[in-house]
From Swiss-Prot:
This is Glutamyl-tRNA(Gln) amidotransferase subunit B, mitochondrial. It comes from Lodderomyces elongisporus (strain ATCC 11503 / CBS 2605 / JCM 1781 / NBRC 1676 / NRRL YB-4239) (Yeast). Keywords: ATP-binding, Ligase, Mitochondrion, Nucleotide-binding, Protein biosynthesis, Transit peptide. One of its GO terms (biological process) is glutaminyl-tRNAGln biosynthesis via transamidation. Coiled coil: none annotated. The keyword Mitochondrion applies.
Length: 511
């Protein structure tokens, strides 16, 4: 029976291709939802979120199978993961620690006692016949996340700031399910540790929903709790929507921020239309298919999960000081970092500051570089020059190739920008030291300049002097001397003028 559900790579790929095709055909409908939407004053919008977040652990929540996201289907499963009789769970302490980090970061009250419960239902992606979760005694309660000027939403002017704060009802630690591809299942995901973050229905606008999700992504990435990616399923969002305090409707299967927005808009319009026609709304669970929400089940046929405590797992008993100890061990918060990086002396663009926060290694690099090169253009050197050099060569940023103190030395050298770019490119491409790059490119006085260097300089000048190039190619060949003069100036006479003249004529195809 189990083998019938095991996935293969070929089947998974075919399913993914079909999904992509369906998504493309839905594009026009999504755009229509977006352009025609508006809130109606007489129909009050209320929304809450349930965010399922995969924790970045080495092993699964209750087994020693490694966590896997892109490996061959069913290559990381244990007997316990597929529910074979006689197997028992053992809690992964790393997962508990990451869940506690999230609870503290979200200002929650960590519970001294929590425990696991069994949530019973039958579905092929849950081979045990139940999910281990925390229904009765969750790990943490009563948290909040507050918006500020960095979140792109209108800040409340009331003294209590209530409209700026989204309350968090609870955080529970639980196991993920397998992943279904049509009629087959990949159990690599089964048992991966999750936290479910449940908010209160405090959202009164779509902008705040979107801002909260992005702020949450930034937070879990910065504290290295989760990769924070919606597209890969590392974060999955269920949205609860109601109008005029009617019974809530839960929308499942939302995998991108764009789909979150469109699903809310569609569901709000559906509920408003029902009420304007004199109908009534009922509690429902609906699925989002990329175009509309579809009924999955109503209150009348809701699943009775028959929760009860898991007798194979002991209670989690924590020290009263655990929250304080974790809080003091966490790095500077994202909000504090944003405030510091966007103000003097850094004055970073907000987008660049957020980028640094999601990449701890890059943040450390920038701060080490800035400690040496304390100038307003530090931002430009890191983002426009250093990272661009890696990106253009199709390489992942690696601090060992160009260390911050070495980069600061290169930036301070008495060379023009083109020369510094050429040296940086050579270092990244060939993974050589600064001194070696300077020697190989011929920047030392006792070394002969290379043709490669002269060619790159000519290409750079051609790209930045399009009007002169157009004039040359329209028949005014003598205008090439303007380019030669620019090249001589940039290289401070390091090359013979005839070298540049010949290269420009060759690259521009003139005689």
């Amino acid at each position: 029976m189990l083998r019938r559900y095991l996935a293969t790579s070929a089947s998974a790929t075919a399913s993914a291709t079909a999904t992509a095709s369906a998504s493309a055909s839905a594009s026009a409908s999504k755009n229509s939802i977006k352009s025609n939407f508006k809130f109606h004053p007489e129909y009050k919008f209320k929304c809450g979120l349930e965010i399922h977040t995969q924790l970045k652990t080495k092993y699964k929540l209750f087994s020693l199978s490694r966590t896997s996201f892109n490996d061959t289907p069913n290559s990381h499963i244990s007997y316990f993961d597929v529910g074979l009789p006689g197997t028992q769970p053992k809690l992964n302490p790393e997962a508990l620690y990451l869940a506690l980090k999230a609870a503290v970061a979200l200002n929650c009250e960590v519970q001294q006692m929590s425990r696991f419960d069994r949530k019973h239902y039958f579905y092929p992606d849950q081979p045990m016949g139940y999910q281990i979760t925390q229904n009765f005694h969750p790990l943490a309660k009563n948290g909040y996340l507050t918006f500020n000027e960095f979140d792109g939403v209108e800040i409340a002017t009331s003294k209590d700031g209530a409209n700026d704060t989204i309350r968090i009802e609870k955080i529970q630690l639980e196991q993920d399910t397998g992943k279904k591809y049509g009629d087959i299942i990949d159990y690599n995901r089964a048992g991966i540790p999750l936290i479910e973050v449940v908010t209160k229905p405090d959202f009164d606008s779509i902008e705040k929903v979107l801002a909260f999700v992005k702020k949450y992504q930034l937070l879990v990435r910065h504290f290295d709790i989760c990769s924070g990616d919606l597209e890969t399923g590392a974060i999955r969002v269920d949205v609860n929507v109601n109008v005029n305090d009617s019974p809530r409707v839960e929308i499942k299967n939302i995998s991108t921020t764009g789909d979150i927005v469109n699903a809310i808009k569609y569901e709000y319009n559906r509920q408003v239309e029902t009420l304007t026609k004199g109908g009534s709304l009922e509690q429902q669970t609906r699925n989002w298919d990329g175009i509309r929400t579809n009924l999955a089940r109503s209150k009348e046929n809701a699943i009775d999960y028959r929760y009860f405590p898991d007798s194979e797992l002991p209670q989690i008993i924590l020290s009263p000081d655990i929250a304080h100890d974790i809080k003091t061990s966490l790095p500077e918060s994202p909000d504090s970092l944003l405030a510091r990086l966007t103000s003097s002396p850094h004055n970073l663009q907000l987008a660049h500051a957020k980028n640094l926060i999601t990449e701890p290694e890059l943040l450390h690099y920038y701060e080490s570089f800035f400690a040496i090169h304390r100038k307003p253009d530090a931002d430009k050197w890191v983002f426009q020059e250093l990272l661009t050099a890696f990106a253009k060569l199709g390489k992942t940023f690696d601090v060992e190739i160009v260390k911050p103190n070495v980069f600061a030395h290169l930036v301070s050298m008495d060379l023009n920008l083109v020369s510094k770019r050429l040296i940086l490119k050579h270092m990244v491409q060939n993974e050589v030291s600064l001194d070696k790059a300077i020697e190989q490119l011929g920047f030392k006085e006792d070394q002969k300049p290379t043709t490669e260097l002269a060619e790159d300089i000519c290409k750079e000048i051609i790209l930045t002097n399009q009007q002169i190039v157009d004039r040359i190619q329209s028949g005014h060949a003598k205008a090439v001397e303007v380019l030669v003069g620019n090249a001589m100036k940039k290289t401070r006479g390091k090359f013979a003028a005839q070298t540049f003249r010949s290269l420009f004529k060759e690259q521009l195809g003139i005689s």
